[in-house]
A protein has these predicted regions:
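Acidic, metal/ion-coordinating pockets
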Residues: 2-15, 27-55, 73-433
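Intrinsically disordered, low-complexity Ser/Pro-rich, charge-biased
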Residues: 20-27
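Ser/Thr/Pro/Gly-rich low-complexity linker/stalk segments immediately outside membranes or between
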Residues: 52-64
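Intrinsically disordered, low-complexity, repeat-rich polar/charged segments
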Residues: 61, 65-73
Length: 433
């Protein structure tokens, strides 16, 4: 289905207002804490001055001079010529960014991160500006929204989806192992509740939507037309009921058994339909590979090659719960990330506690219409799981810096050491041959 550009813009504006409200609340809390610290500092100064009334020499102004010099250097004004050149380049090219996170793995422990009120604002607070900063943001939901009990049946509370939406997530990949975990009724509920939260499901359709909606999603962002498709290797050994075969996009003809025969015909049919839409960029979200395994199979490489032949520009994988290799071809403008890891999960399995939020840069030449992926980067993230504290997702470099500088509510030494190791492993895995 196509998302109306104005509706898409409206959704993001509403979420921006909600985030601003949350940020104001957080700033008030920080201001109160800061005021307490200032009062303590003043008290300490008074005590020190009272005990030592000797006049101290005035400090030299070297640092201030350096700061002023730096400010002068960084505050250089543009000449009319450079301003015109910048404006001309902006009018010729449109640059947008897509953000993608990995698996949101719904378990009892993950649900409990919201506490008694099932509030997940703090869970995603540290990465919200990254999710919200992109033009389109997506992640994979390994679970459903079919109501209580939460966690034990892979069911997430609606408040978790509301928090994701408020944090900036736009698209939810539902073609995965748990698409029909609670049957077709569960799929229907999940699709409806994703939309209720202001996001759009990708890779699935309800039985009622088979005749009215297409098996892909189109987003128009700043004049760039992007097609999103999603496929899964299977659904935890389950098969779609007769008459519902098109409700979930699958990668294998034998998706409910052995995953040995790539469904070339089915994949081709979907992607040829996408090409008729004439998108500028096509992104495929794939739930594939093997869980807790670093190996990329020959089957995955075959699927990736097939999709690129059929016009896919970016392949973004999930399911292994581990970060895996990334491949970028600047000449062709194509990108493959075999797995982004777990965005949020129990973090009990070594290697699943860290992952990345991917950023893809897409550039469109407004004169020729040529559009391609022109770069990528990622933010290393970590699921902090410490005793007597709820799970939360944090940026690794910033969390480590906070620990080193002794900030309040910092991570533990154990988490710090684990993050240092995670940075090494993420680099090694993403750059693997």
């Amino acid at each position: 289905m196509a998302i109306d550009p104005e509706e898409f813009k409206k959704r993001r504006q509403e979420r921006q207002l909600q985030r601003q409200k949350q940020q104001r609340s957080m700033m008030i809390k920080l201001a109160v804490a800061g005021a307490v610290l200032v009062l303590c500092a003043i008290l300490i100064v008074v005590l020190v001055v009272a005990g030592n009334r000797k006049q101290q020499p005035a400090p030299e102004q070297t640092q201030a001079s350096q700061t002023q010099q730096q400010a002068t250097q960084t505050g250089q004004t543009q000449t009319p010529e450079t301003e015109n050149a910048t404006q001309e380049k902006q009018s010729v090219e449109t640059v947008i960014h897509l953000a993608a996170a990995g698996d949101l793995n719904i378990t009892e422990k993950v649900v409990n991160a919201g506490g008694g009120e099932l509030s997940y604002t703090d869970t995603f607070m540290d990465v919200a500006h990254i999710l919200a900063g992109a033009d389109v943001t997506m992640l994979n939901l390994e679970g459903n929204l079919s109501g209580p009990p939460y966690g034990t049946d892979r069911s997430a509370p609606q408040t978790m989806m509301d928090a994701l939406s408020a944090a900036g997530v736009d698209l939810i990949q539902l073609a995965n192992s748990y698409s029909i975990y609670k049957g077709m009724d569960g799929l229907n509920q999940t699709v409806n509740n994703i939309r209720l939260a202001g996001m759009e499901p990708v890779g699935v359709r309800t039985a009622e939507e088979l005749k009215t909606k297409k098996p892909y999603t189109i987003c128009n962002v700043q004049g760039v037309k992007i097609a999103f498709v999603s496929f899964t290797k299977g659904m935890d050994g389950m098969a779609l009921p007769p008459g519902n075969e098109g409700c979930v996009n699958v990668l294998y003809a034998d998706y409910s058994t052995d995953y040995q025969t790539v469904d070339t015909e089915g994949i081709t049919a979907v992607l040829e339909a996408v090409e008729k839409e004439k998108p500028d960029i096509t992104v495929a979200l794939l739930h594939w590979g093997s869980e807790y395994n670093n190996t990329v199979s020959a089957s995955q490489e075959k699927i990736s090659a097939l999709m690129q032949e059929l016009g896919v520009d970016a392949v973004i994988g999930t399911h292994s719960h581990y970060v895996q290799k990334m491949q970028f071809d600047p000449e062709a403008g194509t990108f493959v990330a075999y797995s982004l890891g777990d965005f949020l999960g129990d973090a009990q399995r070594s290697g699943s506690e860290y992952s990345v939020i991917l950023d893809l840069e897409i550039t469109k030449n407004n004169e020729t219409g040529k559009t391609r992926i022109t770069g990528y980067s990622y933010t290393p993230i970590f699921t902090v799981a410490e005793e007597e504290k709820p799970l939360r997702v944090v940026r690794i470099p910033e969390a480590m810096k906070a620990f080193e500088e002794g900030y309040i509510d910092r991570i533990s030494q154990q988490s710090y050491d684990a993050m240092a190791y995670a940075l090494e492993r993420i680099k090694a895995r993403t750059e693997a041959e």
